[in-house]
């Protein structure tokens, strides 16, 4: 007998995130703030400290960038530091479609004085969280022999090898960063 299966996993529901206000506090933009109480995202190009439409230290150094704003994290990453204001869907963009492939084979036979069964299987899974997944291989051999009317013997052996790639949990988990990232911050672009 040979069996195979393929399945796909996706995040079923996502929370609704506000996509109107940029990171910051009390209406002021702060590129290092994790709160989303800054100015309207649509007004970032007019921000007095970071806006590409205004006179500030960045536009004095690099020239005006109409319709954009300066993002220090992008500059530190070696990317173009000027970004067009928009709301990002960081949580949706973070997750992958998970794929799981299962396959197995089984050979079994019953004889006059015994029986045997050999099963082989494998599972390869790529998780919905990037860099997570599992590879699993298993084998099972069962044999039984009737040596005489009153005496039988048997053997049963199992082998399983698993390699699991998982995300860290608790305080080091990535999910707090993904769900907590402000909508104005491009988590995937830095």
Regions found by a protein language model. Give the residues of each.
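N-terminal periplasmic accessory domains that precede
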Residues: 1-4, 105
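Surface-exposed loop/interface segments of Gram-negative outer-membrane beta-barrel transport/assembly proteins
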Residues: 3-86, 97, 127-132, 138-190
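Outer-membrane beta-barrel initiation region
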Residues: 93-98, 105-111
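Outer-membrane beta-barrel architecture
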Residues: 106-108, 119, 142
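Residue-level signature of outer-membrane beta-barrel architecture
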Residues: 109-111, 122, 145, 157
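Short coil turns and loop connectors of transmembrane beta-barrels in diderm outer membranes
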Residues: 112-113, 149
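Residue-level detector of the transmembrane beta-barrel scaffold of outer-membrane proteins
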Residues: 115-119, 152-154
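Transmembrane beta-strand segments that form the barrel wall of outer-membrane beta-barrel proteins
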Residues: 120-126
